[in-house]
């Protein structure tokens, strides 16, 4: 299965029977290389991925400045140290799951809820971890 298929079929999937077209997603290597992404995923700067990786290594690193992706600032909210970073901006937000080799991103806006985004992103991340990725 290609990485793009994981994005298209597992991250951009329908949630509870409704299209999640308000969700942007990507799978990005720890080095910032894009493995696959949805067409709506923002163009990001390498230093934004560096900051995200640093927060996984040192939880709380992004809390004072916020999480930035594609020039958009998200307020960092409760996550799982070293495993999941969550951010909020207005009625939407972001979930990032770290695997052994990649970062799985989900960006959402209403009507998608934080819990729905978390479930989709973390489920794929857990699967990739189980596969040694």
Curated annotation (Swiss-Prot):
SS bond partners: 13-117
Give the residue ranges of motif Involved in PIP2 interaction. Answer: 83-99
Gene3D superfamilies, alphabetically? Dynein light chain 2a, cytoplasmic (3.30.450.30)
PROSITE patterns listed in its UniProt record: PROFILIN (PS00414)
Q: Which residues carry this modification: Phosphothreonine?
A: 113
Gene Ontology CC terms, in alphabetical order: cell cortex; cytoskeleton
Q: State if Cytoplasm is listed as a keyword.
A: yes
Q: Which SMART domains match?
A: PROF
InterPro entries attached here?
A: PFN, PFN_euk, PFN_sf, Profilin_CS
Taxonomically, the superkingdom here is: Eukaryota
| Keywords noted in UniProt | Actin-binding, Allergen, Cytoplasm, Cytoskeleton, Disulfide bond, Phosphoprotein
Q: Does the keyword Disulfide bond apply?
A: yes
- Molecular functions (GO terms): actin monomer binding
The record's function comment reads:
Binds to actin and affects the structure of the cytoskeleton. At high concentrations, profilin prevents the polymerization of actin, whereas it enhances it at low concentrations. By binding to PIP2, it inhibits the formation of IP3 and DG.
Q: What else is known?
A: The variability of the residues taking part of IgE-binding epitopes might be responsible of the difference in cross-reactivity among olive pollen cultivars, and between distantly related pollen species, leading to a variable range of allergy reactions among atopic patients.
Q: What is this protein called?
A: Profilin-1
